[in-house]
């Protein structure tokens, strides 16, 4: 006999753009998001009995996202995700969990003649600010915030040596190499009791995102990196130290390789070791290094 082991459904790829117009200054601020909302609850019969009476139409979910975006602030995204999730579990008594994922796309205000423009923006990278908000009836609100697609490179200040060498090893040890990666950093907040507690901590979300981004960039640039592993751990340590409300910080960093080209075949042209200036960026394969940094448990007395 079969049963529904797990089920959720909703609306994905809901694109939302909101503009805030300051009536005093005329300055406009824009936010563009891609939103996904998935619901869980007493919905098994829609799968097992073809009973649509328990289904909140995904089109209605889409409409709700637009309406709540009009009625509420959409920044920080941690707050808007909490507003959305709380709405669904309060509105529909048979819905007990709402999962909201928000991707905020980058629009950076243009500077024209040295001054910030009032209403013009540029997408200067594919970097996004992401949140995952899970609202569970009777439990609370779990939030994960993240930076994604933050592409960085440094042309020196990285090394890799002392690793396992055996019959499978061809990689040479290096004391100076190019280091490049696409940063994916995620920090998990301690559980919030409800929407009011989230509202009470609103300033911390933007502050922590800024701090996490700055820590990531500063450590990447200044660290004489012995390995991606060592560098990402130092980043996570600093973010946890900055924000006491965080439980964990997770990094996922692909190691995007740049290989020297031996050009000695052309008239003895030197382009290896200390003479290397021309490299070939590699698309794949690439290294992939992951780490979750948490807090040490306090020993019980």
UniProtKB/Swiss-Prot annotation:
What is an example of a GO molecular function annotated in this UniProt entry? urate oxidase activity
Q: What is its main location?
A: other
Q: Where is this motif: Microbody targeting signal?
A: 299-301
GO biological-process terms attached to the record: purine nucleobase catabolic process; urate catabolic process
User: Which keywords are on file for this protein?
Assistant: Oxidoreductase, Peroxisome, Purine metabolism
The EC number(s) attached to this protein equal 1.7.3.3
Q: Does the keyword Ubl conjugation apply?
A: no
Provide the top EC class: oxidoreductase
Coiled coil feature spans: none
Say yes or no: keyword rRNA-binding present.
no
Q: Which chemical reaction does it catalyze? A: urate + O2 + H2O = 5-hydroxyisourate + H2O2
Record: residues binding urate: 58-59, 160, 177, 228-229, 255
In which pathway does this enzyme or protein participate?
Purine metabolism; urate degradation; (S)-allantoin from urate: step 1/3
**Record's family?**
Belongs to the uricase family.
- Sorted alphabetically, which PANTHER family does this protein's record hold? URICASE
List the NCBIfam families hit by this protein, alphabetically.
urate_oxi
Identification of the protein by name: Uricase
State the organism of origin: Emericella nidulans (strain FGSC A4 / ATCC 38163 / CBS 112.46 / NRRL 194 / M139)
């Amino acid at each position: 006999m079969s049963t529904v082991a797990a089920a959720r459904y909703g609306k994905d790829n809901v694109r939302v753009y909101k503009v805030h117009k300051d009536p005093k200054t005329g300055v406009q601020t824009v936010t563009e998001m891609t939103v996904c909302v998935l619901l869980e609850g007493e919905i098994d019969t829609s799968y097992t009995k073809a009973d649509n009476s328990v289904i909140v139409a995904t089109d209605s979910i889409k409409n709700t996202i637009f309406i709540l975006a009009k009625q509420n602030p959409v920044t920080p995204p941690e707050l808007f995700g909490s507003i959305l999730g709380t709405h669904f579990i309060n509105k529909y008594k048979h819905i007990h969990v709402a999962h909201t994922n928000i991707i905020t796309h980058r629009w950076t205000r243009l500077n024209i003649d040295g001054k910030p423009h009032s209403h013009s923006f540029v997408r200067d990278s594919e970097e996004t600010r992401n949140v995952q908000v899970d609202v569970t009836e009777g439990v609370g609100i779990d939030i994960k915030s993240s930076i994604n697609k933050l592409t960085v490179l440094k042309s020196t200040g990285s090394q890799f040596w002392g690793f396992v060498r055996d019959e499978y090893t061809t990689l040479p040890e290096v004391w100076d190499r190019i280091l490049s990666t696409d940063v994916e950093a995620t920090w998990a907040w301690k559980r919030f009791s409800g929407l009011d507690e989230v509202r009470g901590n609103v300033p911390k979300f933007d502050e922590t995102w800024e701090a996490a981004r700055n820590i990531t960039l500063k450590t990447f640039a200044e660290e004489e990196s012995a390995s991606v592993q060592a560098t990402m751990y130092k980043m996570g340590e600093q973010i946890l130290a900055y924000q006491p409300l965080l439980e964990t910080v997770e990094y996922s960093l692909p190691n995007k390789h740049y290989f020297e080209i031996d050009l000695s075949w052309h008239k003895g042209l030197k382009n290896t070791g200390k003479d290397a200036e021309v490299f070939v960026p590699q698309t794949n394969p690439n290294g992939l290094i992951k780490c979750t940094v948490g807090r040490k448990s306090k020993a019980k007395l």
